[in-house]
Amino acid sequence: EGRFTGAVAPWQGKLVFDADEEITQTIKKAGRLVHRGKIEHRYPHCYRCDTPLIYKTIETWFMKIEPLKQNMLENNGRIHWVPDHLRDGRFGKGIESAPDWNVSRNRYWGTPIPIWQCECGHSECVGSLKQLHTLMGAGDREKGKQRHAETVAKVSRSVKEEAGKRLGEFKVDAAWARKIEATDIDENDIHRHIVDECDLICPVCGQTMVRTPEVLDCWFESGSMPYAQNHYPFERAEAFERNFPADFIAEGLDQTRGWFYTLTVLASALFGKEAFRNVVVNGIILAEDGKKLSKRLRNYADPVDVLNGLGADALRLFLINSPAVKAEDLRFSERGVSEMSRAVLLPFWNAYSFFVTYANVDNWTPAGPHAPASENELDRWVVSLLNDTIRRVNDQMEHYNLYRVVPVLVSFIDNLTNWYIRRSRRRFWKSENDADKTNAYATLYHVLLSFSKVMAPFLPFMTETIYRNLTSALKTGSCTSVHLCSFPAADGGRIDEELEEKMDLTRRA
C-alpha cells in the first residue's frame, strides 16, 4: 500500500511520500544533511491512474549480458535494417551500452522461473517436464495432477454456466460449442499455483528444494518466441531449423529496446547467430497535435469511423506513404487519408471505370492478358512506363523500402490518367472498330490488369474488385484472386527509355 513497515519504526504506517519532511529533519538533527533542495526531473507514474510510483530495492534474477555483447554486435551487422541508420545507431549503440538484464518479476501471473533452491546452497534449473518429474517425489506428481483436475473442473463449470447464457446472444454455432466442451488441457499443468507446491529432492544433501517465487519478465518470453512456438527442442526441430533465422519481422521503434533486443539476446546466447535477417521499423503514431494517443483523453479518431468513412485501402496507403515506415513519428490526420484517396484511389478507379464503360458500349472482350504489338506511340509509351514502374517497385520492395514505392505508383497513375487516357480518348470514342481502337482497348486492358497486381499489396480491396472483373471474360490463364497471382515481372524488352524521355519533354512543353 506504499506505507513504511516496522523496519523503520518512526514512520511505520505512513505513506512513503508523506514522510519526506520528517525524514529530512531526522537526518538534519543527526548532523548528516549535506544539502537540501529541489530538482526538476522525469518521474514514473502509473499509466492507468497517473499515480506516482514508488521505487523499492529488491533481490532479482539477472542474465549476464557483457559476455554476449561482441557476438550480438556481429550478428546485428548481418541484419538488414530499414531504415539502415538504426543498425549501428539506436540499436547498435543500445547493445554496446546494455546492462545486465533483470529477467524476473515479483508478481503472481507469469511463467514461473524454473529454479529450485536448497538451504545447502545448491540450485537446480529444470529444463523440461521430464526432468521435473525425475526430481519430484511420486507424491508431488500425483498432488499436481489432482490440483490440475480440480482446477479444470472448476473452470469448465464456470465456462459452461456463463457461456451457455450467451451462446444465443452472439449466435455461436452449437457444433463449435460442443467441440470446445470436449477439449481438455494437458494434465501436466505447470502454472504457478500448482508448480509452487512441487518440492524437489536435492541431489546434493537429499533435503527439500523449493522453487524461487519469481516469474519471468514477459520480454524474456517474447525473445523465446521462435523456439516456444515450435516447442523446440522437444518437438518440430526440423520446422524450427528450416525457418530460423526469420526472413522478416516488423515492429515499432520502441522495440529496439524491446522485442528486437530480446530476440537478439537469446539467439546470440543459444545459437550465436541473428534471430532475423530483415526488419522494417515503424515510428509511433501520435495525435494530430503531436501528443501521445490516449484512450483516456480520446484524442484520436475512432479507427472504425475512419475505415467506414474513408476505407481501409486509403488508410493503408496513407500509412505506407507516411514517415511512420521510416521509423519517424506520424501525426495522424484524417485529412491525410482523404488526400491519399483523392490522389491515388479515385484516379485509379476512374481509369478502370473509363475502360469498362467504353468496353461495354463496344462489346469489346480481351483476347488475352498480354499487351498488343501496337505501333501507336502512346501505346508503346504507356507499356514502357508500366514495365519501368514494375521494375522500380519490385527493386524497392526487394530492399523493403516501402516509403519509396508510393511516389512511383502515384507518378504512374498520373501519367496513365492525365496523359495516356486523356490523349487516347478519341481512339475509344470513334465509331469504327479499326485496328487502332482495338489496340487502344488491348493496351489499356493489359495496363490495368498488370497494374492491379502491382497495387495489390497496397490497395488489397480495390485491386481485388478490379482484377476479378477484368479477368471474368478470360477463359484461361487467370487466378481466382489477385492475391494468388505472382507479382509481375518487368519485360525489359518493352522498356523504351528514349521514348519515355521524348514523351516527358512533350508533356513539359
Segments from the language model and where they lie:
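Short alpha-helical scaffolding segments that buttress acidic/His motifs in well-ordered protein cores
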Residues: 98, 219, 223, 263-264, ...
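Conserved phosphate/anionic-ligand binding catalytic regions in large, soluble enzymes, centered on
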Residues: 46-48, 53-54, 101, 107-108, ...
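Acidic/polar loop patches that form or flank catalytic/metal-binding clefts of enzymes
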Residues: 33-36, 211-212, 272-279, 315, ...
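Alpha-helical recognition segments enriched in aromatics with Gly/Pro capping
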Residues: 1-2, 107-109, 166-329
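A short secondary-structure junction motif
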Residues: 222, 226-230, 288, 321-325, ...
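A glycine-rich phosphate-binding loop feature that marks nucleotide/adenosyl-phosphate handling sites
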Residues: 2, 39-49, 113-121, 282-285, ...
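Acidic, turn-prone loop/beta-hairpin segments
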Residues: 362-391, 422-509
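Residue patterns forming the tRNA-binding/recognition surfaces of aminoacyl-tRNA synthetases
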Residues: 1-176, 187-191, 259-260, 291, ...
